[in-house]
Amino acid sequence: MSEHVEPAAPGPGPNGGGGGPAPARGPRTPNLNPNPLINVRDRLFHALFFKMAVTYSRLFPPAFRRLFEFFVLLKALFVLFVLAYIHIVFSRSPINCLEHVRDKWPREGILRVEVRHNSSRAPVFLQFCDSGGRGSFPGLAVEPGSNLDMEDEEEEELTMEMFGNSSIKFELDIEPKVFKPPSSTEALNDSQEFPFPETPTKVWPQDEYIVEYSLEYGFLRLSQATRQRLSIPVMVVTLDPTRDQCFGDRFSRLLLDEFLGYDDILMSSVKGLAENEENKGFLRNVVSGEHYRFVSMWMARTSYLAAFAIMVIFTLSVSMLLRYSHHQIFVFIVDLLQMLEMNMAIAFPAAPLLTVILALVGMEAIMSEFFNDTTTAFYIILIVWLADQYDAICCHTSTSKRHWLRFFYLYHFAFYAYHYRFNGQYSSLALVTSWLFIQHSMIYFFHHYELPAILQQVRIQEMLLQAPPLGPGTPTALPDDMNNNSGAPATAPDSAGQPPALGPVSPGASGSPGPVAAAPSSLVAAAASVAAAAGGDLGWMAETAAIITDASFLSGLSASLLERRPASPLGPAGGLPHAPQDSVPPSDSAASDTTPLGAAVGGPSPASMAPTEAPSEVGS
């Protein structure tokens, strides 16, 4: 029987070092993420963002960036002004477009409201009402020259137009036998004898606005022929935006005609009639085929708390699902590349991808039920996805990480609060306003925090690359801040215990190294001071600059060693060359690289008789 043995700790390496992974250098935080693919993905996106930011800064000057940022802010403020104006004019004040038919519209029939520009027919007339039923509506204007035959022709045209829109599924399912073949003798009129074509030849244009209101939901689902056969009275009210005063002033009409449309105006007008009825009734949009039901809803001030909770749930759920789907797609792409490179079999992650797709579809369905619109739900998911990508890829400084999400939730909550408080009225315009302010916050944080940090890092890299190369007379000993890995200040060198320098030093007037010798350490100090001056927001930038500093200094060090090795066969005093660095030199021949060679030995020696200019000649 075998026992479970714990794995042994990694043994020492061949040089006495540990065989395990090397500890993290400097201020780097340990990697707590066990999945290396996430690190690869983050590094890839960070590199792409870095390159795009540098290219953007080179193509567009700061003046253009400020102008573009101001333009986005101005656009957001303009849309906010339009929303506030429309809300005050049309939502706060009652809309009385149907006030003249409040007392005489048929409660046992259908009220049909149409918006037509420069219409030539009567503003109010009846359809599908016999001569006896006309007496029930005294004072009602009758369309001049309208007899039964012309009315039938008009209804035939209306029938063709109605069945051309998306509401065809309701009429065909409810009344499948309304249209009889022409040979049938049971047909009542010409409109029923006309066969319905398989493919509709005419659809509603986008500028048509027609709604129908009735207290009975079944009346709205009947076809035009059935309404005429059953003599269901239909009152048609035509509204002309150029003549009716209920559409506001000239600026309001311009906004309604060019940007908003008349759907909300029609629904608000019908809602004014429904508030006076005990049974609120039902509404049908003839053009889109959507059905609505009027209910009594009282939104208190506490509804904002419910809107905030719903916003948090929807946003976090969509963000989690989108991040999971991105990870699964990235893993599949990496596996596919490995298969093409190494000719190895992979397993397609069908179950995770199918799970996340079904979850996204279910989330969109839930959001569509809440917003009563699939388009609004889709655009909200798209906005959350863009914000999630911006936070994961573009936010690196601590200021952006701390404050940008607050602005996003603030603007996003403004849309949820407006939609929940006013029951979805002008919700599309509110969503556009929220997105424009979110877009401005993205551009602002990128211009004022992320881009300066990236440009500062580029300047540090250019300063390191433009440093003078190490010459033969430059000391190749590592600076104190490079040798001292612990971060403690370096102590004064001991003349008895310090290892010899790798090359001669050109002393200055006071016995200290020349200005050339201080070039590498001053360069590193300058880079560190620049990074420290930028504050705590540039921690990741200082770390990258330190890595580049180490690499460039060590490469210059190795190059100088290779250049100086054949040029100095003898020591400074004409003797044998120094021992290698890893061998221990005699204590009486050790000298500090900051002390003149003549002062290193107490008594007279043959080395002291050498000319004092010998070290400089050899070094040069």
Curated annotation (Swiss-Prot):
Pfam families: Membralin
Modified residues (N-acetylserine): S2
Bilayer disposition of the protein: Multi-pass membrane protein
Subcellular location: Endoplasmic reticulum membrane
Function as written in the Swiss-Prot or TrEMBL entry: May have a role in the ERAD pathway required for clearance of misfolded proteins in the endoplasmic reticulum (ER). Promotes survival of motor neurons, probably by protecting against ER stress.
Family label: Belongs to the membralin family.
Protein name: Membralin
Organism ancestry: Eukaryota, Metazoa, Chordata, Craniata, Vertebrata
